[in-house]
């Protein structure tokens, strides 16, 4: 079987079964969320931009927000036969890509995104197995659904598995 590499854009999500890969690039302050069911060999990847949808009205793309994307991704995985209790998460991104003289939480969107993703995963009872968060460099996330492995390519730092 040919292994497909399925792209996940910014404010996007997708699902795949073994042996395919889900890939998202451009994780700066954004956070990539890989959810995997080892029993079924099925996973999903979301690329969120913002932590919280409650400050917005007329939301056209719910996947942009951590609080909406995670439940939607879980729902899509359940439609494929995944048992939510089997899901495990690996997350990456949440960098501070810009230096501001005001270091307030309002400006630190990367940190806020990371915290929001952790909060919604906990609320959904999905444990986080590993993470690669923070710093000040962009990342690419490569999620291999054959084993649930996630490789992170960080600008200027090479590739590591989380």
From Swiss-Prot:
Gene3D superfamilies: 3.30.1330.200
GO molecular function: protein-glutamine glutaminase activity
Superkingdom: Bacteria
Keyword Hydrolase part of the UniProt annotation: yes
Pfam families: CheD
EC number(s) from the headed UniProt entry: 3.5.1.44
Gene Ontology biological-process entries: chemotaxis
Swiss-Prot/TrEMBL catalytic activity: L-glutaminyl-[protein] + H2O = L-glutamyl-[protein] + NH4(+)
Entry keyword set: Chemotaxis, Hydrolase
Family: Belongs to the CheD family.
Main function: Probably deamidates glutamine residues to glutamate on methyl-accepting chemotaxis receptors (MCPs), playing an important role in chemotaxis.
NCBIfam families: PRK13490.1
Name this protein carries in UniProt: Probable chemoreceptor glutamine deamidase CheD
Native source organism of the sequence: Clostridium kluyveri (strain ATCC 8527 / DSM 555 / NBRC 12016 / NCIMB 10680 / K1)
Lineage of the species this protein comes from: Bacteria, Bacillati, Bacillota, Clostridia, Eubacteriales
